[in-house]
Design a protein with these regions (language model features):
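Short, well-ordered, aromatic-rich surface patches in folded extracellular/luminal domains
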Residues: 2-37, 65-70, 82-141
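Short, flexible N-terminal segments of the mature chain
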Residues: 38-58
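Conserved long hydrophobic alpha-helices within structured protein cores
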Residues: 43-46, 75-85
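Acidic, aromatic-enriched beta-alpha/helix-loop junctions
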Residues: 53-81
């Protein structure tokens, strides 16, 4: 899910800190029978929050836009900071032993003029992951 080769290497933040701007965020969530993706893209002072589902088609899967809303970019950055997004960089949540099924996620965010935050996991999530997904679902409904 690389966004573009022009961005800087991963940032290695302290456990605390904030981002000052967002260019793009993609959160990919999948499970046994579902795959969905949330995408936030910022242009100027507006942030487009989009929700996609992946549908089975004849030759694989199709990414289909279900809903899109616009929010203020500053509001989105403030919310992402409340979830401690910067501290997610480098998170790798390996699948817990003995768990046979679960939800997997992959996140990539381009922030602060080109720095990239990456995180992924399988039934193992960074702090405030649930709050982020609840917030995304809430703004889209």
């Amino acid at each position: 899910m690389s966004m573009n080769g022009r961005f800087k290497d991963n940032i290695r933040p302290e456990r605390s800190g904030t981002i000052t701007s967002l260019e793009k965020l993609v959160l990919h969530i999948s499970g046994m029978r579902m795959t969905e993706e949330y995408e936030i893209t910022v242009e100027g002072g507006a942030a487009a929050v989009s929700y996609y589902v992946f549908r089975c088609v004849e030759n694989g899967f199709e990414r289909a836009l279900e809903k899109r809303v616009e929010l203020g970019a500053d509001e989105v950055v403030e919310k992402l900071n409340s979830f401690g997004l910067l501290s997610w960089n480098g998170f790798r949540g390996d699948h817990p032993r003995g768990v046979r099924d679960g939800i997997m996620f992959r996140l990539e965010a381009v922030v602060d003029g080109g720095a990239v935050i990456r995180a992924d996991g399988s039934e193992n999530f960074p702090k405030h992951f649930k709050e982020l997904t609840f917030w995304l679902r809430g703004v889209l409904n």
